[in-house]
């Protein structure tokens, strides 16, 4: 509980009590969505190593983010606060204030070693870490650069998912003080756009035709904000950058970005890469596709490359778990796997994230539990990424500052079901105008309903009954018979904005 030390040691097994406290390995990927994780949804791919985490622990089936965008999501995780409180609201202009209170700083003060390896994406230099080794910005899939603690940049040879895992295992084995508990943040670049596969998996999934989502040809009727976006596979997915169709005479908006990325390959890998994708491009040109046929072709290329990137990720999660097992650390370590947000895999015809609609608002969250924490199977309580910070502090026996807005998940990990658990989730997306043209919006989600307000250069409310309309196609706001539900949701939305001290309430007051 907040402002109270959790007395863990009396309930720990003797070996853990002798050591002190649990270690924490926090594995976070980029844009990995629950639809592409077989313990959540096995229609598309198999992820046996990710599923291992859930099989030996828990799977949260109502897991959400506070702001579905990479940098802001990471800031929410580190601080336990919504974007308007931690100050990092968007990627376009956001700069993380590293002087503020963060969960790694608090754990460090409690005696933990803290390390982060991989994607940082918060602009400023990491603070609160005993060790860090990060990729600049989004990082690269092939032969990526890494920034060291002395601010020097080193180009590493290999595939980024392998390298981040190598560095993480090396830190656990060789660079930490093994007499002290630790928290290690393993932040992968995968599965971020533009989904460049590892060489050994170039040919994977090429014989697979992925099913087209039932909302793929959504016409956005009654949802002007959804219609205004610029993230449709058909019209917005870049033919070269995203689907790797290129030729000297083809110039697309992002083609130069693409050539910069593959220009990092050494000559041998570049030859293999070009041989594979040149054949794809030749086949594409021969087809002379247009209209829906072209859109569905781009969708299949997108799905195949995403699945290939994910296969390498799953391999490396397996390597991490195997190391923890072989090093005798599994029973004393909480292993957390999640993503910075969900992602659209063709639902509503989209790729990317940002919206409060389910596919990007929700995010996978599985945990392998150490000895002493007995919960197993599905956890249905609603959780959010602002809850990770208080959870880790609670697990470490460290005080939880009163200004942290999330709540500790530790009771759930013990197998408890608190009667006063939250019944709703608050969301606020801030980045507009920006890439993909998703309007600013905030909203509330309960078990059954979702109410959203799109604002700034638009003033539109949307209301969905998730029980009868899980695909969120039929906006019920203003419809006859919905007055009572709308009034109740408005009242609760206002209460949440007051609770979380969101200044948007002053600009758009709810009566």
Regions found by a protein language model. Give the residues of each.
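Sec-dependent N-terminal signal peptides
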Residues: 4-14
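Formylglycine-dependent sulfatase
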Residues: 2, 16-455, 459-461, 470-491, ...
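Residues forming the ATP-binding cleft of Hanks-type serine/threonine protein kinase domains
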Residues: 467
